[in-house]
């Protein structure tokens, strides 16, 4: 069965089991009893080329559900934002689906990760079907890259692929500012997450299209983001100097991330 048909059937079959508390008229809110790792929203102040970023998350995981969370603020010049990487995390049991993220490279060698997610309440679990039924709000998690990657490689046992985007420094900085604008917007005007229309990959595509309209078309490879890296390659948003399969093999950082977990040089080591 073709993946898109499987995905559609999954939504139809599981989605028929509408939760008892579901209401089509409920408004999105930032005021709920959130999972601790999703309880604090980031925000940003931008004054010309000066950026202050509040509440950058760093979770220290014992297991996926046992962790300590700390937040710190960062101040830097926009000129310090130099590169951006596209990160793909295929679902273990259905690799045509995936979580996607961005990671911005800074002049000091650090990385600022951006993960667009369903914002879960305490004791709530994610499901594709519930995500289509206004059961989750949307959150932009701004975090230490090690937090975002090792959560997935070590504690969710999923592969992670990190691709350097082909973009000028000016384009990277414009993308970063557009992301921060969205972060601030959601702090004031919460939205529902939607599995098909307002998810990790559609939001990242929206940011890119805001800078250059129609760069990324809405289609199957957005609905099935496990193939979004191949779409990025076809659109020359990733390095096309080598065959895609070679690039993909180089982008796999799972083993490196597990080996470098806890290292102060985590971001450098996974890119070596």
Regions found by a protein language model. Name each.
Residues 13-15:
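C-terminal motif of bacterial Sec signal peptides marking the signal peptidase cleavage site
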Residues 17-20:
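Regulatory N- and C-terminal appendages and interdomain linkers associated
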Residues 22-74:
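Membrane-interface segments at or immediately adjacent to transmembrane helices
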Residues 10, 78-81, 226-231:
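Short secondary-structure subsegments characteristic of cysteine-rich extracellular domains
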Residues 145-148, 152-177, 187:
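Charged, low-complexity helical/coil segments in non-catalytic cytosolic or luminal regions
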Residues 178-272:
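Activation targets extended, charge/polar-rich intrinsically disordered C-terminal tails
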Residues 2-7:
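Sec-dependent signal peptide recognition
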Residues 51, 56-160:
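Glycine-rich catalytic cores of cysteine/serine-nucleophile enzymes that process amide/ester linkages
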């Amino acid at each position: 069965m073709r993946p898109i048909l499987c995905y559609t059937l999954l939504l139809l079959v599981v989605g028929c089991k509408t939760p008892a508390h579901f209401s089509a008229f409920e408004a999105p809110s930032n005021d709920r009893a959130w999972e601790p790792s999703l309880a604090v929203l980031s925000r940003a102040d931008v004054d010309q080329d000066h950026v202050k970023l509040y509440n950058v998350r760093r979770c220290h995981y014992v297991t996926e559900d046992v962790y300590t969370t700390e937040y710190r603020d960062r101040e830097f010049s926009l000129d310090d934002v130099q590169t951006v990487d596209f990160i793909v995390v295929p679902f273990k049991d259905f690799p045509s689906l995936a979580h996607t993220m961005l990671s911005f490279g800074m002049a000091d060698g650090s990385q600022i990760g951006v993960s667009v997610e369903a914002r879960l309440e305490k004791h709530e679990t994610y499901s594709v079907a519930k995500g289509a039924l206004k059961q989750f709000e949307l959150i932009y998690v701004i975090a230490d890259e090690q937090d975002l990657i090792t959560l997935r490689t070590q504690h969710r046992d999923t592969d992670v692929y990190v691709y350097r985007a082909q973009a000028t420094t000016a384009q990277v900085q414009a993308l970063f500012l557009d992301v921060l604008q969205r972060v601030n917007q959601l702090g004031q005007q919460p939205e529902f997450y939607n599995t098909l229309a307002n998810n990790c990959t559609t939001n990242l595509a929206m940011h890119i299209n805001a800078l250059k309209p129609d760069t990324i078309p809405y289609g199957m490879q957005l609905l099935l983001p496990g193939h979004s890296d191949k779409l990025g390659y076809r659109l020359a948003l990733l390095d096309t100097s080598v065959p895609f399969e070679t690039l993909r093999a180089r982008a796999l950082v799972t083993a490196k991330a597990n080996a470098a977990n806890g290292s102060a040089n985590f971001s450098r080591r996974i890119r070596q």
